[in-house]
Each structure stands twice: as C-alpha cells, then as structure tokens.
Design a protein with these regions (language model features):
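Extracellular/periplasmic bilobal clamshell ligand-binding domains
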Residues: 327-364
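Periplasmic-binding protein-like
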Residues: 142, 156-159, 185-195, 218-223, 228-231, 301-324, ...
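Short amphipathic alpha-helical coupling segments at ligand-binding clamshell hinges
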Residues: 73, 214-218, 289-301, 309-312
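Extracytoplasmic ligand-binding site segments that recognize negatively charged/polar headgroups
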Residues: 59-74, 86-104, 108-245
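A ligand-binding cleft/hinge motif common to bilobed small-molecule-binding domains
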Residues: 120-123, 247-266
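A bilobed periplasmic-binding-protein/Venus flytrap-type ligand-binding module shared by bacterial periplasmic
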Residues: 160-167, 204-208, 279-290, 309-310
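Extracytoplasmic "Venus flytrap"
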Residues: 33-45, 53-72, 197, 280
C-alpha cells in the first residue's frame, strides 16, 4: 500500500478498481429487496448495474399486447442493458394477480415486475408488492403514480364513443352524456359487459363524476335506451360497429378507433367529457428475485426513452411530456380537455359495486 502511495502504477490502479467493483457486488448481494427498491444514493445506478449483471434477467408479468409494445420495450431495454434478458408472461389483470398469489402462497418467487390496470392493486392488497423509488416518478402528475410509492404508470387509456362514419352524420353525433338519451339512439348503441373496459367502468365514471344520486338517475334513463350487450372485448365491439351491426359503441378505446381509421375503416371516435380514463400501472414484487435488474427495468419504462417506445407502438404514454403519435388522443391535444382518471385503488375498492349495479339494472 505504501508503494501505491508513492507511485500510481497500472497494477495499483487495477487493484483499486477491482476492490471498488468487489465492494459494489458485495453491497448488491447483501441488500434486501426493500433496500434496492428504495435506494436514493448518488451511486444508485452503479449499484443497480453491478447487481443486475449478476442477476442476468428480469421477469415481467404484463397485460400489454406482446407484439405491439412488449417486444419493442424488451428490445429497447436489452439494447441499453445487454447483460439483462427480459422474460415475460402476458395475461389480464385477474390472471396476473391469480398467478402471483398462487406462486407466493407456494413460496415460489418468479416475478420481478408486475403490470396491469388493476393487477398491482390486487397483488398489493394481498401484501405482495414492494414500495419503490425511481427518479423518473418526479416527472409524473399525482394521478399517474401511487402516493404510497407502490406503482407508477406506463400508459393511459381513454374510453370514448366509437361510431360508423357511414351510418352517423357529423351533426348527429352525441357530444354530451345527455345526448345519449335522445330517441335517435334507442336500440342503436352497443357496449361490452367486460369488467375491465366495458359498461361497469362507464357506470363507475358516471357515479364518480355526477355523484351517486344524480348518477343513478341518469343511468336509469340510459337503461331505457335498450343498449345492446356483448361479452366481446371493447376492440371486438368496435369491429362490430365498423361492420355496420350498430352505428354507435359506448366505451371503446379511442386509440383503437384511430388505428382502424388510419387503416381505412369507416370509423371514428367521439369524446364525452369527462372522459373515462384508466391507467396501466407497474410495480415491484415484494420478493422480486432479481431486484437490481427489476429496478433498472422500472426506471427504463418510466423514463422518456422508454415512454417514446410506448409512443411509437401506438399506445398512449403516461409521461406528460411525451404526446401520443396522434396528439388529440390525449387530453389537451385538441379534442377533449377533461378526463376522470380512475385509479387502480378506486377500481379495486368500488369495481364490484359497479359490476353489481350493471348486472342488477341492465341485465335483468
């Protein structure tokens, strides 16, 4: 060591560098999942990288469409961090939550990052999510991140009307919720019975924004409009409208209508404000077996670089500074201003009530 003080030889520098790397590796492997998740130190990135190199992969449970956005995100992340492989499982929120709960009850810890519109809250309520810190979360508004730190958001969904442009004239379009009660639309509308993207969420938005008394009074009037019901997804409902089976669909994803319109289909979307908005959330599993790689992945998804991949995949990025490819698909883009973001916690707490109301009032 005295020799190193006298002369900074190449050998001494190599020894010092080796000791530094060994320190970070030892630190990484002695840390708990919570330690890694909540790390805020100046050397955070270095610690995450050294730990992730040892872990080698990250397991991602998601409801996002694989070919449209999951693979591009995987490729973008692996290009940034070639020493980490992204593996994934795709399912809806219920399937993801069920899979995590089954694994955790068996003390089999496979998942690192959980994603979905309601999956994170469902898993969190079971006690199996970990609070985490990401420097990128500071760039997001309060409605797009959890105040307790359990989730952030990759993308948002806006539910609007979808209509067949051959069957509905521009001057006939409903422009308010009250317009749906016009005689013109009786028996001419369709919606999905899906809990996640159909009539129950529409009902929830009405009750949350109008209040229980006024909301239920409105819904009773809407019930008299004899809306056609289908167990099909919102995307499939839109396809039925494109085919001309019904002129108007309630509660479809506006970006789906945009994609079909640009492909030449006779369809467009119309917002009713406040627009129903839901959030695709992401978070860290409580016993994530690869927490360093998981935190790098979460950082990447929340970063502007990751959000731009979401953008070019024709999803609607959550980051307020990353617009949709078609800017008017998001609030403030020209077609609507007001959106009611239904948080996953509200969806978890009140979703069953909305389903019950729909089944009791609209299905009987």
């Amino acid at each position: 060591m005295t020799f190193c003080k006298r002369r900074l030889s190449a050998r001494c520098l190599l020894v010092a560098a080796t000791l530094v790397v060994a320190f970070y590796v030892r630190l990484a492997w002695s840390a708990t999942v919570e330690d890694v998740a909540m790390m805020k130190s100046p050397d955070r990135q270095k610690v995450l990288i050294e730990g992730a190199k040892k872990e080698g992969k990250v397991m991602f449970y998601t409801g996002l469409i694989v070919d449209q956005v999951v693979r591009p995100l995987k490729e973008g992340f692996e290009k940034e961090y070639p020493f980490v492989q992204v593996d994934f499982f795709r399912g809806n929120s219920e399937n993801i939550a069920r899979r995590v709960l089954t694994e955790y009850q068996a003390k089999r810890y496979e998942v690192d990052v959980v994603s979905g519109s309601a999956a994170t809250s469902m898993v969190q309520r079971a006690g199996f999510m970990q609070r985490f810190y990401s420097p990128h979360l500071a760039e997001y508004p309060p409605e797009l991140k959890d105040s307790k730190g359990f989730w952030g958001s990759t993308n948002v969904y806006f539910m609007t009307l979808g209509y067949n442009t051959r069957n509905v004239k521009a001057n006939e379009l409903p422009r308010t919720y009250e317009d749906l009660l016009q005689p013109r639309w009786k028996g001419q509308m369709m919606w999905s019975t899906s809990r996640g993207s159909g009539a129950p969420q529409f009902i929830g938005n009405i009750l949350l924004t109008m209040g229980p008394e006024a909301g239920k009074a409105y819904l009773q009037k809407l019930k008299a409009q004899n809306i056609a019901k289908s167990t099909a997804s919102a995307r499939q409902i839109l396809d039925l409208v494109i085919a001309g089976e019904y002129p108007l669909a309630i509660q479809i994803f506006n970006h789906h209508a945009y994609i079909s319109k640009t492909a030449g289909a006779p369809v467009d979307w119309q917002p009713l404000e406040p627009v129903t908005a839901t959030i695709n959330t992401i978070g860290l599993a409580k016993h994530a077996p690869r927490p360093h790689a998981a935190m790098l992945f979460l950082d990447f998804l929340l970063s502007k670089k990751g959000q731009k991949i979401v953008q070019v995949s024709n999803y609607l990025p959550s980051h307020p500074e990353i617009p949709a490819l078609q800017a008017d698909l998001k609030p403030g883009g020209g077609r609507f201003k007001k959106a009611n973001y239904i948080s996953p916690d509200v969806l978890y707490d009140q979703g069953n009530d909305w389903v019950d109301y729909f089944q009791n009032q609209f299905l009987k």
